Regions:
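N-terminal secretory signal peptides that target proteins for export/translocation
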Residues: 1-20
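Bacterial N-terminal signal peptides
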Residues: 24-36
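Boundary at the C-terminal end of the N-terminal hydrophobic targeting segment
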Residues: 37-43
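Short coil/linker segments at helix-helix boundaries
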Residues: 43-68, 77, 88-147, 154-196, ...
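Canonical tetratricopeptide repeat
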Residues: 48, 82, 152, 201, ...
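Solenoid-like repeat scaffolds
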Residues: 71-75, 224-228, 242-245, 275-281
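A cross-kingdom marker for long, charged
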Residues: 258-301
């Protein structure tokens, strides 16, 4: 008898203080998702899965969930549908907690000292439910076909998101490291089967880049465990995902921009974003509309 998973309940809109976004991530992600600056990246439109990612990067979470649900209904055995819906949950929580403020995210001191509103338990439950659903479907697919690259990719994505939740939301660094290690492992397995599954490079790239920011003794210890701590390699893999990836290409481009800001190369970081903005003339009006839809989304989820 196949396993069944309850449909996650709609997260309530928590009463949280208004905050100013110094550099709205929704604006940046709109630029990144629609940009032609990376010529190999196909536009995120045309299928419910593509449309879901485009809506999510636009912070239209209600639309993202709807698109991903359409995909899951049409493809009930595909682990990527539920993994993608989990991404919409974690992006929602990121937005509510201010994690998606690019200038805040690029500054460790400001990020760690920021005020942290309570986590919405409905969002956590929805996220965990979709993670469990995706991992179950991936395990079934691997049992059926040990060379199923998509299944390993799904496990890389779910492990990576759990690392993000542990680090950026729960602040459990050891748990984040364990999940990051799993994400890198599964990504390498997916790439060994399908080298052109460029999105899978993101997990390995982020592991190398983020762990390289630790102090030298910590990098040495992590290196002994097999963790990737090579910053240059991390940047290379992020660029590869940004140029050749699909669903995760916008996120890889964002990480590259954050990297420039973190390294003090403000002008280079801005240059990346300015170059991207030139291919998106509709961005100003679209970003304003997105902010309105995000507020409406939160009220509907009460």
């Amino acid at each position: 008898m196949p396993a069944t998973f309850p449909t996650p309940s709609a997260p309530r809109s928590p009463k949280r203080p208004a905050r100013r976004r110094s550099t709205p991530i929704l604006l940046l992600l709109l630029l990144l998702a629609s940009s032609s600056a990376f010529s190999h990246a196909a536009p995120l439109t045309g299928t419910p899965l593509n449309d879901g990612y485009h809506a999510m990067y636009n912070l239209d979470f209600a639309a993202a969930h709807n698109h991903f649900q359409q995909w899951m209904t049409a493809h009930p055995d595909d682990c990527l549908g539920s993994a993608s819906d989990a991404a919409a949950y974690i992006f929602t929580e990121f937005d509510l907690l201010g994690v998606l403020d690019i200038e805040l995210f690029a500054d460790d001191n400001r990020f760690t000292s920021r005020k942290r509103p309570d986590i919405d338990p409905a969002l956590r439950q929805g996220f965990q439910s979709r993670i469990a659903q995706s991992e179950h479907l991936a395990d079934v697919a691997i049992q059926r076909n040990p060379n199923d690259a998509n299944a390993y990719y799904c496990k890389a994505v779910t492990s990576g998101m759990q690392a993000d939740w542990a680090s950026l939301i729960d602040r459990h660094e050891y748990g984040a490291f364990r999940f990051s290690e799993l994400a890198s492992k599964y990504a390498k397995q997916a790439l060994a089967i399908s080298p052109t599954l460029y999105d899978a490079n993101l997990a390995v790239g982020i592991e190398n880049y983020m762990l390289s920011l630790k102090a030298a003794p910590i990098r040495w210890i992590l290196g002994m465990t097999g963790a990737g701590t090579n910053k240059a390699e991390g940047v290379r893999l992020l660029k590869l995902t940004a140029e050749q990836g699909h669903y995760l290409a916008p996120f890889a481009r964002l990480m590259l921009a954050v990297g420039e800001l973190r390294d003090g190369r403000t002008q280079q970081g801005k240059a990346i974003l300015i170059g991207l903005s030139r291919s998106s003339p509709r961005t100003p009006s679209t970003s304003a509309r997105s902010r309105d839809s995000t507020r409406q989304y939160r009220h509907k989820r009460q």
